[in-house]
Swiss-Prot record:
It is a single-pass type II membrane protein. Pathway: Protein modification; protein glycosylation; Glycolipid biosynthesis. Residues 33-121 are annotated as: Stem region. N-glycosylated. Glycosyltransferase that catalyzes the transfer of an N-acetylglucosamine (GlcNAc) moiety in beta1-6 linkage from UDP-GlcNAc onto mucin-type core 1 O-glycan to form the branched mucin-type core 2 O-glycan. The catalysis is metal ion-independent and occurs with inversion of the anomeric configuration of sugar donor. Selectively involved in synthesis of mucin-type core 2 O-glycans that serve as scaffolds for the display of selectin ligand sialyl Lewis X epitope by myeloid cells, with an impact on homeostasis and recruitment to inflammatory sites. Can also act on glycolipid substrates. This is Beta-1,3-galactosyl-O-glycosyl-glycoprotein beta-1,6-N-acetylglucosaminyltransferase. It comes from the Eukaryota. Keywords: Disulfide bond, Glycoprotein, Glycosyltransferase, Golgi apparatus, Membrane, Nucleotide-binding, Signal-anchor, Transferase, Transmembrane, Transmembrane helix. Glycans are attached at N58, N95. Disulfide bonds join C59-C413, C100-C172, C151-C199, C372-C381. The lineage of its organism: Eukaryota, Metazoa, Chordata, Craniata, Vertebrata. One of its GO terms (cellular component) is Golgi cisterna. Belongs to the glycosyltransferase 14 family.
Length: 428
């Protein structure tokens, strides 16, 4: 009798309620465990700060423009220890990418979308490279998102091990691939345009969902997170964004005479070319663009654009006038009117931040940007750590040039900063 009474009290209404609540809690916990993200996707694991065991640079101070820390970096680069630091080779990447799960985990690629906003606005990338596999890995990791699409064009002259390493990296991702047709790229020749066109075709045919195409080279690096890029592109409201200005007289020789490749170099034949086959005047610009999917479709399919491209194939640096000119043709989706009032300089366009040596100086005295903290190659600044503080205040999406051999700390600090910025809101 006492036992029965005990049972009735044990399973009275309040006790049953708590028991059922406990069971429901256990079921809910089990479901959440099944559907939670993989352990390696934790925010802390994806942070890049402290990732380089050979670096004792304070990136926070670097990004603040601290003169002492910047000078420390410059001195570090001169040391024997720095010059002998371990470097990853193409063969290292070939070996690492044999185990894709390990490669993705150890290299800390982001393999799940961070926000719904980014998922709803996929971006396509054309990346033209020929060497420096470590730099490509850093660039791809910095811009990689699972909802985006990435075409990598490898110069046919590149070493076989480099191509194999790129193919190895691409094989680890469903949305990264090597271009179906590879060109032997010659500086300032049509082959540079053709490399981007090949990726354009592949990207256009493989997926209909991406909104914009951004072209890059192996020495570019983002200065915005993917979410910031998405929001910038949304604000463009279907317009393309690239440098396009009135053609200066000193560049007319580039397209008024015929050029041909001789012994691997572009040579002026002295032969006068016929005028371009279009009513719109030629405009000056750069190789870099941010264009809509509709623009890409028009470029690939329009008969008049095809005629213009055929005409441009024996000119000097056609990439520096072709995209800029197409952007001013009235029928092109997302284009600008041809009036000079609509000219867009490299500093006003968002496609790329580049420092030219002959424009550098004191901003307070009217220069567009301060002096280069790194070195110059063909009058272009290869950025150093001292360039980051000013650069990150600009509106551009990417900057050029960065080089692991010149200043890896500039890339390291920028990489860490962008990754932390992308992840900092996920824990809240």
């Amino acid at each position: 009798m006492l036992r029965n009474l005990f049972r009735r009290r044990l399973f009275s209404c309040p006790t049953k309620y708590y028991f059922m609540l406990l069971v429901l809690s256990l079921i809910t916990f089990s479901v959440l465990r099944i559907h939670q993200k993989p352990e390696f996707f934790s925010v802390r694991h994806l942070e890049l700060a402290g990732d380089d065991p050979y670096s004792n640079v304070n990136c926070t101070k670097i990004l603040q423009g601290d003169p002492e820390e910047i000078q420390k970096v410059k001195l570090e680069i001169l040391t024997v220890q720095f010059k002998k630091r371990p470097r990853r080779t193409p063969h290292d990447y070939i070996n690492m990418t044999r185990d894709c799960a390990s490669f993705i985990r150890t290299r800390k690629y982001i393999v799940e979308p961070l926000t719904k906003e980014e998922v709803g606005f996929p971006i396509a990338y054309s990346i033209v490279v020929h060497h420096k596999i470590e730099m490509l890995d850093r660039l791809l990791r910095a811009i990689y998102m699972p909802q985006n699409f990435y075409c990598i064009h490898v110069d046919r002259k590149a070493e076989e091990s480099f191509l194999a390493a790129v193919q190895g990296i691409a094989s680890c991702f469903d949305n990264v691939f090597v271009a179906s047709q590879l060109e032997s790229v010659v500086y300032a020749s049509w082959s540079r345009v053709k490399a981007d066109l090949n990726c354009m075709k592949d990207l256009y045919r493989m997926n209909a969902n991406w909104k914009y195409l951004i072209n890059l080279c192996g020495m570019d690096f983002p200065i915005k997170t993917n979410l910031e890029i998405v929001r910038k592109l949304k604000c463009s409201t279907g317009e393309n964004n690239l440098e396009t200005e009135k053609m200066p007289p000193n560049k007319e020789e580039r397209w008024k005479k015929r050029y041909t490749v001789v012994d691997g170099k572009l040579t002026n034949t002295g032969i006068v070319k016929a005028p371009p086959p279009l009513k719109t005047p030629l405009f000056s610009g750069s190789a870099y663009f941010v264009v809509t999917r509709e623009y890409v479709g028009y470029v690939l399919e329009n008969e008049n654009i095809q005629k213009l491209m055929e005409w441009a194939q024996d000119t000097y640096s056609p990439d520096e006038f072709l995209w800029a000119t197409i952007q001013r043709i009235p029928e092109v989706p997302g284009s600008f009117p041809s009036s000079n009032k609509y000219d867009l300089s490299d500093m006003n366009a968002i496609a790329r931040f580049v420092k030219w040596q002959y424009f550098e100086g004191h901003v307070s005295n009217g220069a567009p940007y301060p002096p280069c903290s790194g070195v110059h190659v063909r009058s272009v600044c290869v950025f150093g750590a001292g360039d980051l503080s000013w650069m990150l205040r600009q509106h551009h999406l990417f900057a050029n040039k960065f080089d692991m051999d010149v200043d890896p700390f500039a890339i390291q600090c920028l990489d860490e900063h962008l990754r932390h910025k992308a992840l900092e809101n996920l824990e809240h």
